[in-house]
Amino acid sequence: MSTSGPRAFSSRFASFIDKVRWSLLQQQKSNMDNMFESYINNLRDVDEAYMNKVELESRLEGLTDEINFLRQIHEEEIRSLDMDSIIAEVRHGDDLRRLALDIEIATYRK
């Protein structure tokens, strides 16, 4: 019986060690599952952030194009207004010269 005692103890101890190993493996698997799930969620967040970045860059490009277009139109309108102002000044100057000439002619006719 003395041999069966140590063998039985050894067998029970080996069984206990196997159970502990199995429990540790299950915990590791559970921890890895959580880790992979967290990793996948992080990848989804990164993907969403990248898609938002692409959308914002596209909107920025469109707004920049619109600003450049409006700036060009504004500059053309300013040039046109400047030309209109110059033309008005020339016409006003011509009108004043004609008026002065008419006054001078009227003065000589008297």
UniProtKB/Swiss-Prot annotation:
Gene that specifies this protein: KRT8
Domain of life: Eukaryota
Quaternary structure note: Heterotetramer of two type I and two type II keratins. Forms a heterodimer with KRT18. Associates with KRT20. Interacts with PNN. When associated with KRT19, interacts with DMD. Interacts with TCHP. Interacts with APEX1. Interacts with GPER1. Interacts with EPPK1. Interacts with PKP1 and PKP2.
Record-stated family: Belongs to the intermediate filament family.
GO cellular component: cytoplasm; intermediate filament; nuclear matrix; nucleoplasm
Domain IF rod, chain residue ranges per copy: 1-110
Cross-link (Glycyl lysine isopeptide (Lys-Gly) (interchain with G-Cter in SUMO2)): 29, 110
Purpose of the protein: Together with KRT19, helps to link the contractile apparatus to dystrophin at the costameres of striated muscle.
PANTHER family the UniProt entry points to: GATA-TYPE DOMAIN-CONTAINING PROTEIN, KERATIN, TYPE II CYTOSKELETAL 8
Region listing for Coil 1A, in residue ranges: 13-25
Location of region: Linker 12: 80-86
Name listed for the protein in its UniProt record: Keratin, type II cytoskeletal 8
Segments of this protein annotated with the region Coil 1B: 40-79
Gene3D superfamilies cross-referenced by the UniProt entry: Vasodilator-stimulated phosphoprotein (1.20.5.1160)
Record keywords: Acetylation, Coiled coil, Cytoplasm, Glycoprotein, Intermediate filament, Isopeptide bond, Keratin, Methylation, Nucleus, Phosphoprotein, Ubl conjugation
Record-listed Phosphoserine modification sites: 2, 4, 10-11, 80, 85
Region described as Head: 1-12
Signal peptide (from-to): none
Other comment: There are two types of cytoskeletal and microfibrillar keratin: I (acidic; 40-55 kDa) and II (neutral to basic; 56-70 kDa).
Location(s) in or outside the cell: Cytoplasm; Nucleus, Nucleoplasm; Nucleus matrix
Principal subcellular localization: cytoplasm
Region (Linker 1): 26-39
Keyword Membrane set for record: no
Post-translational modification N6-acetyllysine, affected residues: 53
Pfam families: Filament
